[in-house]
Amino acid sequence: MSASLAILTIGIVPMQEVLPLLTEYIDEDNISHHSLLGKLSREEVMAEYAPEAGEDTILTLLNDNQLAHVSRRKVERDLQGVVEVLDNQGYDVILLMSTANISSMTARNTIFLEPSRILPPLVSSIVEDHQVGVIVPVEEMLPVQAQKWQILQKSPVFSLGNPIHDSEQKIIDAGKELLAKGADVIMLDCLGFHQRHRDLLQKQLDVPVLLSNVLIARLAAELLV
């Protein structure tokens, strides 16, 4: 029987960019995508997941192509419920595709991949003592990103570049800003960044560029071979 993969997302993720990374190894018919908020309107999302005063939040992309702050507690609660359903359905691997710092969910039977738990040590082992620069889509994500990459030998440097709303030149300028700050490896840790952004930056800046969704997708694919 062919291996099966369930991709779980919080909001909107460009699956057309992710699937080619996986279909080299697994038939597309054996891949399913499940989004917690992706099919809901902004009004429906905020009615169910609006954060209470002082509550920890997650920043996610909704189907109006705009970001929203939602309650971490409510999202993690309902994501765990979806994981349990998928686990009971017999998937071989469940892949959570999110750059949010979520690492508290469990699955009883299937392999469950949480990027926030797996990627930081993986990237740290790849870059060793090189200076990493991270392009962050919005300023609000800077504290979360700084916390996420604490494991690196050298504290990362940051610049702002939004893959959804900014031009290619703005993304290149964000990369140049990182080089000026001493970076010799660039990290794109946002699901809006695609292979074309990585290729663009590598060509223009001549430094290695790591793309988080490529790293986690390839890891998932290896587990399915």
Curated annotation (Swiss-Prot):
Q: What GO molecular function annotations does the UniProt record carry, in alphabetical order?
A: racemase and epimerase activity, acting on amino acids and derivatives
| Known role | This protein of unknown function is encoded by a gene that cotranscribes with the aroL gene, which codes for shikimate kinase II.
Q: What protein name applies here?
A: Protein AroM
Which classification does the entry list for the species? Bacteria, Pseudomonadati, Pseudomonadota, Gammaproteobacteria, Enterobacterales
